[in-house]
């Protein structure tokens, strides 16, 4: 979608996938220091770095996806979505698609409200579509909750061995 939008207005896109939170600021800096018109940062964990960069580069527009800005910053717009509704839609689809009546979800920590809301929406969506379905939702412990693919893979495999097909 981003690439199509850029093409429509004669622009272009570049991106960096950050694997370590300590790199957020320097990765944003790579674009901001080159006078990009707009920089999009994704994820609530990047909110602090995006806010700092917006203050340092007032002539660059910043968009923070899943980032709530408590204070108004003229060149920074936070986009926050209804996680429970997205979770409900995903859960409803899972409830319709399951052949085993066992569905699961492997999520980040439930101490982060959007993650918890997504999980509850998922649970409610499955139940609405398929009241007979068993639902297993697991949350990571708060430490390193969004950068632990080994844990996620192990939990998903566990659910699969217990009969979950979604």
Language-model segment annotations:
Residues 1-166:
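A residue-level marker of the well-folded mature domains of exported/periplasmic proteins
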């Amino acid at each position: 979608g981003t690439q199509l939008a850029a093409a429509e207005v004669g622009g272009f896109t570049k991106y960096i996938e950050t694997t370590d939170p300590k790199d957020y600021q320097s990765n944003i800096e790579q674009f901001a220091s080159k006078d990009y018109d707009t920089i999009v940062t994704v994820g609530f964990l990047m909110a602090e770095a995006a806010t700092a960069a917006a203050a340092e580069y007032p002539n660059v527009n910043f968009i923070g996806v899943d980032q709530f800005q408590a204070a108004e910053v003229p060149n920074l717009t936070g986009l926050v979505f209804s996680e429970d509704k997205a979770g409900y839609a995903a859960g409803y689809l899972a409830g319709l698609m399951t052949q085993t009546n066992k569905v699961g979800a492997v999520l980040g920590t439930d101490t982060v409200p959007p993650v918890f809301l997504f999980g509850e929406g998922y649970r409610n969506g499955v139940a609405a579509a398929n009241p007979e379905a068993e639902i297993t939702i697991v949350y990571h412990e708060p430490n390193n909750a969004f950068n632990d693919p080994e844990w996620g893979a192990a939990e998903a495999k566990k659910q699969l061995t217990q009969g979950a097909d979604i």
